[in-house]
Amino acid sequence: MRRPFRATPVQKDGPRSNRDIRVPRVQLIDAEGQNHGDVSIQEAIAMAEEAGLDLVEIVPNAEPPVCKIVDLGKLKYQNQKKAAEARKKQKTVEIKEIKMRPNIDTHDYEVKMKAALRFFEEGDKVKVTLRFRGREMAHQELGMKLLQRVKEDTVEIAKVESEPKLEGRQMMMVLAPR
């Protein structure tokens, strides 16, 4: 015989309110912020309905739980705005890549380093990639010297996150801002 379908109960997001609060007594704060002390839950709900607002559990872990008389819709809206603002302020760290060759000219090197400094100021990580072509693979020490030079030039503003390593025909190093 088949078992009957039993869906998981819907979890409400946000604080408990009105009849969802299942404790005998609460500490009540009214809409003006005045503390009414320890009150029975029925009395608190009656006061909230009288004011045309909702009874919302603010601190559920307290003994007794702290409840406030507020407009639940307005409270949820304010919480959504706060969360959106926090998300907007978060910055995702990107990895910017700077590609070079082992026999790079001095001016080209300076231009690449200026770009790397700009990336560090923006808070991004920088991946320095050296590509070896043809017979350059025989002179990997030149690539290692160049990456050491990059490391020395950025020592005040960046730290090495991954040391230089060779992968195929490319040598890579990742730097992160301090």
UniProtKB/Swiss-Prot annotation:
**Does this UniProt record's set of keywords contain DNA repair?**
no
Q: How does it assemble?
A: Monomer.
A molecular function (GO) held by this record is: ribosome binding
- What does the UniProt entry say about where the protein is found? Cytoplasm
**Record region (Disordered):** 1-20
Record organism: Brucella anthropi (strain ATCC 49188 / DSM 6882 / CCUG 24695 / JCM 21032 / LMG 3331 / NBRC 15819 / NCTC 12168 / Alc 37)
- Residues in coiled coil: none
- Function noted in UniProt: IF-3 binds to the 30S ribosomal subunit and shifts the equilibrium between 70S ribosomes and their 50S and 30S subunits in favor of the free subunits, thus enhancing the availability of 30S subunits on which protein synthesis initiation begins.
Report the protein name in the record: Translation initiation factor IF-3
Instruction: Give the similarity note.
Output: Belongs to the IF-3 family.
InterPro entries, from UniProt?
Answer: T_IF-3_C_sf (IPR036788), T_IF-3_N_sf (IPR036787), Translation_initiation_fac_3 (IPR001288), Translation_initiation_fac_3_C (IPR019815), Translation_initiation_fac_3_N (IPR019814)
User: Which Gene3D superfamilies does this entry report, sorted A to Z?
Assistant: Translation initiation factor 3 (IF-3), C-terminal domain, Translation initiation factor 3 (IF-3), N-terminal domain
Which Gene Ontology cellular-component terms appear in the entry?
A: cytosol; membrane
